[in-house]
């Protein structure tokens, strides 16, 4: 076979086209038994390719993949096969595994595929594929058909209307193909027609791209038919493969890891076009590779989360704007119209708005408010005044003439002032102190304090001192005094006032404590 020539087997449309080593598929001769009636083809390296001579009777051959050691080993004598309508062709392919394609899934569901194909077609064509990684031979797996599809070469269909299945080979890929007539599939009994329903038509589309060559695997179309001669390819008449759904799953697993490795080496723009794998199984169900999902994700289609975020975002923005404007304007109105200070004229006894009203308008509270500042000082002054009054009382008891000389006009004004202060509700300690400074007020308070000491039993005064009023009544010469009834009335009034003052002072002390 020349480097640019195309040689085909007559009657089968199974031809091979080889080109350069970088773009073509190198064929290595596999040791096979030579029999009569075999023809050989030369590969680019000078090796021979043995072909079966009985390929003329095939009308619609179907390709059935056999994994590794599951190729049938039972040999049927060639004499029995000559001239029979069930002429068969077994193609044994050994391929070096590509580093980028790994098959890990295990499956052995393809043992009966060839017999089912033979049941449907009078002249089936079985292909036996086995993979080798270096010198180590892996266990037969159902996913090795995927490796065969990934490393064998680029498969192009004859008709554009048929399905596609191709693979671009790597530069370092070397493969050997041997077609011999010594290997036959085992004869099997006819199977019931009910079992044929389990195997359905599946369209396999495998697109793999090798980053070293820069060759891009594309769907074949009218514009791409001119590039078929540049690549070595193996074309078959029947582009459909009979595969069960279990083999579909294993093939998907085998191709996933290799495609993921190649995806890391290629730029992102080509990933959505180059690496797309779709498998059609039972009922038209479609399972895609992660790269296909990545290609779909690259399209300008928003994810559901983004859609939800876009739906929620305008609502949130609108609410935020409306709320922000409302509260902002409300705050500005408060700031633009501050509360003006009160312009009322100052009134005594009425507190201005905004100021702490420490003193209430009750009649007894003003004294308490003023005593808040005097506090202990007023109490100390009162004790001193009591002591002075006690001394004056002792002096008055010794001097009886001073008791007779009490002027009535001087004693009346303090009483009237005390009544007025009680009526107005503005009693001051200072007014009492000022009244005590004058002579008349001192005399009146002396009598008041003496009565207070008698009623309350104050211990500050010396014990055993008689009351001054009783002494005044007992003085010799005062019994017939016309002023005695008036003085007694004043004494009664003073006692009443004293009791009132005492109650006020007790309340004040309890308030301070």
Swiss-Prot record:
Keywords: Phosphoprotein. Residues 1-48, 210-229, 236-287, 390-414, 453-481 are annotated as: Disordered. The keyword Electron transport does not apply. The modification Phosphoserine is found at residues 43, 84, 123. Residues 37-48 have a biased composition (Polar residues). The keyword Phosphoprotein applies. PANTHER family: GENE 4779-RELATED (PTHR31866), PTHR31866:SF4. This is Uncharacterized protein CXorf49 homolog. It comes from Mus musculus (Mouse).
């Amino acid at each position: 076979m020349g480097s640019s020539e195309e040689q085909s087997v007559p009657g089968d449309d199974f031809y091979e086209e080889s080109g350069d080593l970088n773009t073509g598929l190198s064929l290595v001769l596999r040791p096979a038994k030579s029999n009569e009636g075999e023809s050989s083809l030369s590969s680019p390296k000078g090796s021979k390719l043995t072909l079966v001579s009985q390929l003329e009777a095939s009308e619609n051959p179907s390709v059935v993949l056999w994994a590794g050691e599951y190729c049938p080993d039972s040999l049927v004598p060639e004499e029995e096969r000559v001239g029979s309508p069930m002429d068969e062709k077994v193609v044994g392919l050994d391929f070096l595994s590509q580093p980028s394609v790994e098959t890990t899934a295990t499956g052995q569901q393809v043992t009966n595929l060839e017999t089912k194909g033979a049941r449907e077609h009078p002249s089936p064509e079985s292909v036996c594929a086995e993979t080798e990684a270096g010198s180590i031979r892996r266990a037969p797996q159902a996913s090795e058909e995927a490796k065969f599809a990934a490393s064998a070469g680029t498969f192009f269909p004859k008709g554009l209307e048929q399905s596609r299945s191709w693979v671009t080979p790597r530069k370092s890929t070397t493969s050997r193909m041997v077609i011999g007539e010594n290997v036959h599939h085992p004869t099997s009994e006819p199977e019931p027609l009910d079992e044929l329903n389990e195997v359905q038509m599946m369209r396999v589309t495998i697109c793999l791209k090798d980053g070293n060559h820069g060759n891009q695997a594309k769907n074949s179309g009218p514009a791409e038919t001119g590039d078929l001669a540049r690549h070595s390819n193996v074309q078959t008449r029947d582009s459909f493969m009979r595969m069960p759904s279990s083999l579909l799953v294993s093939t998907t697993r085998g191709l996933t890891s290799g495609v993921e490795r190649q995806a890391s080496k290629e730029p992102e723009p080509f990933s959505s076009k180059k690496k797309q794998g779709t498998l059609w199984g039972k009922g038209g169900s479609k399972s895609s590779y992660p790269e296909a999902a990545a290609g779909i994700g690259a399209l300008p289609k928003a994810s559901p989360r983004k859609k939800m975020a876009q739906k929620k975002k305008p609502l949130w923005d609108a609410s935020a704007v409306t709320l922000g404007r409302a509260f902002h304007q409300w705050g500005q109105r408060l700031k633009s119209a501050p509360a003006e200070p009160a312009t009322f004229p100052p009134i005594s006894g009425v507190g201005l708005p905004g100021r702490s009203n420490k003193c209430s308008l009750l009649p007894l509270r003003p004294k308490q408010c003023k005593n808040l500042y005097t506090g202990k000082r007023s109490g100390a002054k009162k004790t001193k005044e009591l002591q002075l009054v006690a001394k004056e009382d002792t002096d008055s008891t010794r001097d009886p003439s001073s008791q007779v000389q009490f002027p009535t006009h001087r004693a009346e004004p303090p009483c009237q002032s005390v009544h007025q202060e009680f009526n107005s509700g503005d009693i001051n300690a200072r007014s009492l102190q000022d009244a005590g400074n004058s002579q008349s007020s001192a005399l009146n308070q002396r009598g008041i304090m003496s009565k207070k000491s008698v009623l309350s039993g104050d211990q500050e005064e010396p014990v055993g001192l008689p009351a001054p009023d009783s002494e005044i009544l007992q003085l010799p010469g005062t019994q017939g005094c016309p002023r005695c009834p008036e003085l007694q009335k004043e004494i009664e009034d003073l006692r009443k006032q004293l009791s009132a003052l005492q109650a006020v002072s007790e309340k004040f002390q309890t308030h301070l404590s």
